[in-house]
Swiss-Prot record:
It comes from Synechococcus elongatus (strain ATCC 33912 / PCC 7942 / FACHB-805). Gene3D superfamilies: 3.40.50.20, ATP-grasp fold, A domain, ATP-grasp fold, B domain. Homodimer. This is Formate-dependent phosphoribosylglycinamide formyltransferase. The lineage of its organism: Bacteria, Bacillati, Cyanobacteriota, Cyanophyceae, Synechococcales. InterPro entries: ATP-grasp (IPR011761), ATP-grasp_carboxylate-amine (IPR003135), ATP_grasp_subdomain_1 (IPR013815), PreATP-grasp_dom_sf (IPR016185), PurT (IPR005862), PurT/PurK_preATP-grasp (IPR054350), PurT_C (IPR048740), Rudment_hybrid_motif (IPR011054).
Amino acid sequence: MTFADRLPRRLMLLGSGELGKEFAIAAQRLGNTVIAVDRYAHAPAMQVADASAVISMLDGEALEAVVQEFQPDLIIPEIEAIRTEKLQEFEDRGLTVIPTARATHFTMNRDRIRDLAAQQLGLRTARYAYASCFEELQTVAAAIGYPNVIKPVMSSSGKGQSIIQQPDQLQAAWDYAIAGSRGDSQKVILEEFIPFELEITLLTIRQWQGPTLFCPPIGHRQERGDYQESWQPAPLRPDLLAQAQAIAAQVTEALGGAGLFGVEFFVTPDEVIFSELSPRPHDTGMVTLISQNLNEFELHLRAVLGLPIPAIELLGPSASRVILAEDSGDRPSYAGVAAALQEPWVDLRLFGKPDMRPQRRMGVALARDESVEAARAKADRAASQVTIQPS
């Protein structure tokens, strides 16, 4: 399948955050029409899109109406909060969902993707179990042991995740997970805590025609289950990199379709352990905006349209550092931008979100240098210069 025989194409983004904004810009550079859909007005991708719509994407009827109105060539999910059953219905009617409706459904439900990896494909993952009530959580926690990690089966951006050291923390973790769940889900996954040396994202590109491709591995650090900084290339032994690539190829092949996938791993001294997967550009991959000849958004676009990807080249050691809001309010303004940009090989992305709240990601600093350590320090300096205030 290819959509590159005739451009432009009409691309509908379901989710219009900062990742969708960068994808929309990449799509428009090749003349495509972008329709940005999200649950709130003035979302980042809406600011650059050709058209937009504000709906609840958990509402199947609202999804039907917006697809009927705009008649997209491709439907491209960008977030988790979508009625994925409706995507399958669209696909059954001949519409193209990226990468596939099945892949979107599996990866937006942690139980589906974990069972696919561990049970169907036989891949090494953390030991895990599910719980649908607090009493069941107590039982599986005792079986798997402590420390452990509790996550909602359906959530995004680290919402509802906790690391549990002892049984008296379970009730608070259960309450936090249910509060962070998407939709009406009352199910959590509890998994053993892996004492990893490094967490990495392997950006994996499936093409309609052609081999599966990989970007150099990206290391990242998280707090509260959400990414704070990433760097590329991550230090990884050749044998462990080969393991990660083989696992990523196997999982993405099982999901099918075309596009860029963010495949996450825990790295220990002896192995890489599959963690999670996103069937779209990944937040830790924003570092590729400065690190690669083709960033993750351009790679995703080329893959879904069936355009060639002759080479993926690392331009130099690079890093990203998030810029977080500290306060709440509307119409945020940014100070310190000039100071942040005073060093060479530094760039910023300020997302243009219409409101702010504590710990909300409002921008990212990007840096390149002679080493990963220097790039990380430079990105951190740049991010620290930027302050955000409500108008």
